[in-house]
């Protein structure tokens, strides 16, 4: 019945749910039409007549469709529905398919072309999977079925999920499965699952059912609206698929096969011991409230070695950007483009004064900024250093010149240094120093703790200034519990791992240097040097930026940032590629060099 799909199955059976505009049943019957089948038997229950009318005679040229009605569908489970079709199973070999699946066409060829007569398609366990699991040996013999109530998260490495597509021979159905199913239902009733019969059969000395792993074939089981949303992303095509991924703004753990070169995270931190410490305290942190702003300001001050009165902690830098710009960035606001769009998006559009460097690398110096904005009457100037997405970097000595100029001009200067620890000089280039902040109360520094510290899921960021009244006011703007206990505890223990953090940043710089040289060998890319954890690349041949992004995603499950649609690029073909660890970077390089 699909109750968890809510309104989508209020007046429709589950297989009528549409994925990207196509009902599941239509997709399935079209796939079956391409096979050499004697008939298709559909067991119907809830809204069965509506389903029959929907199917009509549209598939008569390729399929012989028969229906079996389950009049007590609301009191039974799938074991009863299958039992209603047992006579059909006794007549011929059977493909058994559940109606809430979406999968690639090749799945049927995979199971039909395999000579073994009795097979269950299985997929290596991934975190999204729910329901019956199996364990198999090196010969794909099924050792046991693991029902949902016996699932053990400590044993997931040994689990395979049943895809719920089976091939049963006529003999297996007649001599093994159906006799056991009949005995099972007599003993336990009809409100059970047919997989439980297979679990019982595994206790036989000789099990005639083998598993067939599907490898990287795409599939999804749709039980609720979240499943539907994910399935529509996985099974979208081309530009539509890329757009669906981009609109998620993260959460890519739901897509374990996707390699994310879009979002920007240090691959070498935090270290394993720190992760273990966080895990060891998980239960306590999960069940207790975090501290308020006073304690977290103290922790942030300790984290960066600055006065707690100079810093405000946020639920990611994005929260602080919003709070600051919407309230304090009044008057004309200078922005260096291209940039992280959250900054200009939060400002009043009519107040924006845009500086777009006049070169193909989008590079600029402190002197370029001063010369452009000198006569613009700014109240606020903001930019990112190193910049996003260009990777352009203004050295600290030149940045101090810009700080002095804005001070003399009574301009508030906001510098986002979220990527500064990736620079060759590392943390030595930071502006988060009490002496710098205290001497320049017009200076505001934003720093994300997601990027170089490798913990974007914790949603941590800080805003700092020598203007204590400003910081005090910002602390009142955000909620009293604006970060969670896990983020707070991370800040609490960071000091124990700080030396490892600096080692990780140096290791990152080494990999960035290697990766840059390799990227430069891709003939259709012009790679712009970067001091951040990404490269802005111009595509000079073969593809547009959107075509390359779509191709990498559809063929290789690799996600990159298409910058071509951003206004500052004026339709030019630029992409941004994150720097990950060597293994991941080499996978991207192999894909780029194959295209």
Feature roles, as predicted:
Residues 22-92:
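Conserved N-terminal catalytic core of the sugar/cofactor nucleotidyltransferase
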Residues 60-132:
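Conserved beta-loop-beta/alpha segment of the NTase-like Rossmann-fold superfamily
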Residues 1-10:
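N-terminal nucleotide-binding beta1-loop-alpha1 segment
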Residues 104-188:
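Conserved core of the sugar-phosphate nucleotidyltransferase
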Residues 509, 522-556:
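Conserved PLP-binding catalytic core of the aspartate aminotransferase-like
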Residues 110-114, 363-377, 389-452:
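Active-site pre-lysine segment of PLP-dependent enzymes
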Residues 158-162, 269-273, 292, 442-528:
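PLP-dependent aminotransferase class I/II
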Residues 230-288, 376-377:
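N-terminal "arm"/small-domain region of PLP-dependent enzymes with the aminotransferase-like
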